[in-house]
Amino acid sequence: MIDKIFKKDLPDEEALPFPADWVKTQPRKVEDILSGLSVEEQVRCVLGLDPQLQQNLLMLSEKAVEVTQALPAEEVYNLIKEVGREDSLLVLSMASPDQLQYFFDVEWWQGDRFQPQQALEWITLLDQCQDPETLEWFLSEDFDQKVMLLQAFLKVFKNDEMTDSYEGVEGLEHFTPDGVYDIFFKVESSKEIRKLLLLLAEKDSNVLHNLLEAVIWYPVTPTLEK
């Protein structure tokens, strides 16, 4: 199993099935060699290498998504941090929901305090990716974290006697995904969040409605950054 591959068993560049400089000088040959390797064998090739070389190898693999998602989350996170978030968008777009959760757990918290600005930066970054797994992450477990995320960015009301107070929305951008829920953005950069909500409405409207109801009714967590 891939999760039983340990660093002490991993090859260095000299143990790759081709000279490391072929990644730049003979990329077609590297592609051909990688195409003959299983996902697990490719994972063994990638693990423990220099992050830039890791990214270059992934970009040459026909099974790049499978290999990326088979890597330990901390390995992919280290690659993204070392190469740079803006320069590793292709790798980020291939990360699995579980890997994204690991990134968010590390990046969105300072001690026990949630950092909304950090979260917004990652949501904005993922919006630049091609078909990222952000939507699948929203459909995964840890419902409360999604609620906390949305509470940091939104005020939500409905036009009924229980939830129609509409307090503190003066001057805030208004949006409704379905004509039922009135959403007011507490942040200036709302494009990415709006897009995510629309995608979620299209993918699974029940999940979106449950999240918006929770934003209305859940107490705001004391760990939210003021």
Regions picked out by a protein language model, each given a short descriptive name:
Residues 1-94, 98-226:
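General marker for long, soluble alpha-helical cores
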